[in-house]
């Protein structure tokens, strides 16, 4: 009986021992210990040292975070993938409970020294310390990164500009005989992959072209893969806030030409338009990107619009000046004529008065007084008639001069309209041409 109980106790202990295996005896732990026990991460993982390790790269742009035109920097968020083969990290999966893939610390294995040549700031990406390794030794290192890279940003066609920024990947130390590069996906698939891009931002992703070439230098030949991120600015917000108000102000200035050229309110109106445009330009100056390399077309557009407004105001001022100078000179003439007639009449009466007193009798003088009064009255009527006639002539000349100014104003308006139309066509053509390049 005691023997029976002893056998039963041994069986229960054996069953419990097999039901709860120790962690050190698990297949995953045995596999990890076997792979890393004599692994040297300082050595490139190949059995034949003359054979190059090929690193396959892939890139997927997620968003454009910032475009710094003044400092010529582009900040993008992307998903970056590296795949290479480690000949020292392969195993027979049938010996380890059919384990096909495991995760290992990146710090414990060899990793290629791939960098981006256009880096200008510290890489901002989450720290992912693990990589996946399959039974054939293929290592997958996938991680999201934020890249701040140098880029030659051209703002000549703003806000219809297209930017082409390159990201060049290569090994910083190993030549092409040690580390070669390749594409993880087809190049056409990389170029047209826009599924994960955020289209609600200011920029629109057009394509991501990729090329492979070997850079030759004195230190050796290095394999390089270049990804060209082509993005286009969404111009609607800038068209609404910058271009349309400017166009409206120019149309209002064109409408002021329908006011009479002798109307003083025309100058006041044009002055208000010019002041309003100046205030608008100052308030919107921060919306236009500033680049030391070139002046954008929209900056030229603002400058030319202001120059046209100043030219329009100057033309109206000159027309008013010519009109009132002619009117002032014509108004002085009848006053001089009237003053000359009065002086002649006074001298005539003065010379006549002494002679009448010496030669005529008192009776005749009594009958001569009414006659002299009528003559004086007649002379006054003649003077008034001459003055009115002169005024009519002045008014007629003023009307004729005003008609000439009106025709001249219409001619200047047509020239102004032709210049504005030619400038608009030229600007639109340049915008269309540069937006396609």
Curated annotation (Swiss-Prot):
Positions on the Cytoplasmic side per record topology: 256-266, 325-410
Annotated signal sequence is 1-21
Q: Which UniProt keywords apply?
A: Cell membrane, Disulfide bond, Glycoprotein, Ion channel, Ion transport, Ligand-gated ion channel, Membrane, Postsynaptic cell membrane, Receptor, Signal, Synapse, Transmembrane, Transmembrane helix, Transport
**GO CC, one annotated term:** plasma membrane
Q: Which GO terms fall under biological process for this protein?
A: cellular response to growth factor stimulus; chemical synaptic transmission; inorganic cation transmembrane transport; monoatomic ion transmembrane transport; regulation of membrane potential; serotonin receptor signaling pathway; serotonin-gated cation-selective signaling pathway
The listed locations are:
Postsynaptic cell membrane; Cell membrane
User: So what family is this one in?
Assistant: Belongs to the ligand-gated ion channel (TC 1.A.9) family. 5-hydroxytryptamine receptor (TC 1.A.9.2) subfamily. HTR3B sub-subfamily.
UniProt subunit comment: Forms homopentameric as well as heteropentameric serotonin-activated cation-selective channel complexes with HTR3A. The homomeric complex is not functional. Heteropentameric complexes display properties which resemble that of neuronal serotonin-activated channels in vivo.
Q: What is this protein called?
A: 5-hydroxytryptamine receptor 3B
Q: Which organism is it from?
A: Rattus norvegicus
The organism that produces this protein has a lineage beginning with: Eukaryota, Metazoa, Chordata, Craniata, Vertebrata
